């Protein structure tokens, strides 16, 4: 489930840490969260799409690793990011 270029630019603009930032951990987590949301909606309608289900689990794992990295680097930034993204109760 690829994101449209316009939506990618919106996410980058919202989560970038400086003007030329396109690949920081914050931006990557935001992109993965968007992809996970779209893929979850797809899987609700297509329950037997096992290859997409595996891709979803891989994305969730990657997002978890990136969030762990952010948490180790800066606890305040981590808390602000998960609040903005609306993940983890």
From Swiss-Prot:
Query: GO biological process annotations for this chain's record?
Result: translation
Q: Report the protein name in the record.
A: Small ribosomal subunit protein uS15
Q: Which GO terms describe its molecular function?
A: rRNA binding; structural constituent of ribosome
Q: Which organism is it from?
A: Trichodesmium erythraeum (strain IMS101)
Signal sequence span per UniProt?
A: none
On the tree of life, the source organism's domain of life is: Bacteria
Supply the gene name.
rpsO
> What family is this?
Belongs to the universal ribosomal protein uS15 family.
SUPFAM superfamilies found in the cross-reference section: S15/NS1 RNA-binding domain (SSF47060)
Known partners and oligomeric status: Part of the 30S ribosomal subunit. Forms a bridge to the 50S subunit in the 70S ribosome, contacting the 23S rRNA.
Q: What does this protein do?
A: One of the primary rRNA binding proteins, it binds directly to 16S rRNA where it helps nucleate assembly of the platform of the 30S subunit by binding and bridging several RNA helices of the 16S rRNA.
Query: GO CC: one term?
Result: cytosolic small ribosomal subunit
Q: Which UniProt keywords apply?
A: Ribonucleoprotein, Ribosomal protein, RNA-binding, rRNA-binding
Q: Name one Pfam family in it.
A: Ribosomal_S15
SMART domains referenced in this protein's UniProt entry, alphabetically: Ribosomal_S15
């Amino acid at each position: 489930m690829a994101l449209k270029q316009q939506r990618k630019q919106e996410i980058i603009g919202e989560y970038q840490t400086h003007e030329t930032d396109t690949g920081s951990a914050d931006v990557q987590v935001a992109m993965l969260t968007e992809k996970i949301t779209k893929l979850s909606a797809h899987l609700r309608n297509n329950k037997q799409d096992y290859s997409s289900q595996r891709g979803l689990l891989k994305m969730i794992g990657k997002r978890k690793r990136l969030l762990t990295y952010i948490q180790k680097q800066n606890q305040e930034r981590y808390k602000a990011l998960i609040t903005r993204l609306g993940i983890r109760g």
